Regions:
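Nucleotide-binding motor/catalytic cores of P-loop/tubulin-like NTPases across gene-expression machines
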Residues: 61, 71-72
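Short, surface-exposed ligand- or partner-binding patches at beta-edge/loop junctions that are enriched
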Residues: 130
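Active-site-proximal beta-strand/loop segments in catalytic clefts of secreted hydrolases
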Residues: 14-15, 67, 77-78, 117
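A secondary-structure micro-motif
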Residues: 84, 88, 96, 117-120, ...
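A structural signal for short beta-strand/turn segments enriched in small hydrophobics and glycine
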Residues: 11, 42, 48-50, 86-89, ...
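Beta-strand/loop nucleic-acid-binding surfaces
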Residues: 74-82
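Flexible, gly/ser-rich surface segments that form the specificity/activation loops bordering the active-site cleft
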Residues: 51-57, 110-127
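Extracytoplasmic/periplasmic cell wall- or extracellular glycan-interacting regions that localize
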Residues: 1-52, 57-59, 64-66, 94, ...
Length: 148
């Protein structure tokens, strides 16, 4: 991979099928989960347009960025408040650093502050759930990011 990481941290849940032998369960992870210090700022890995800002149960606040050529990245578990603008678009403000805010249809450059990561209540760290899509296929983000 050649792309910068969206946050500095370590992958705690890999892409694809995860087998838990203790619980005898199998789960499918459509992205990766990166553990980072709480309140870490997430950065864009490519330039593009914010196509959607929404809340999804189990994923928290979600920001979807369209990078053109049918590529999208999805940042989940983003801290902040979502407001609806008079034109119907949404804006998300970080409650940790209010200077960090993005809006739907906004063009953002590579390495742009897109949000802060919500605190994970169990261990005082943050977890970013990060996905890369091409058309309707989810890709393994780890293979796109610079190897650590």
């Amino acid at each position: 991979g050649k792309l910068q990481w969206p946050v500095s941290g370590k992958i705690i849940s890999k892409f694809g099928t995860q087998i838990n032998s203790e619980l005898n369960t199998t789960t499918e992870n459509i992205g990766i989960e990166i553990e980072c210090p709480k309140h870490t700022t997430a950065m864009t890995i490519m330039d593009g347009y914010i196509s959607k800002i929404t809340f999804i149960a189990g994923m928290g606040n979600v920001i979807i960025i369209n990078h053109g050529d049918d590529y999208k990245t999805i940042y989940s578990n983003i801290d902040g408040s979502i407001i609806e603008n008079s034109d119907g678009t949404k804006t998300i403000f970080s409650t940790i650093d209010p200077s960090i805010k993005v809006s739907e249809n906004q063009y953002i450059s590579n390495n742009y502050k897109v949000g802060t990561i919500s605190n994970n209540l169990t261990n005082n760290s943050g977890i970013l759930h990060f996905q890369i899509w091409y058309k309707d296929k989810n890709l393994n983000p780890e293979s796109w990011l610079i190897q650590k």
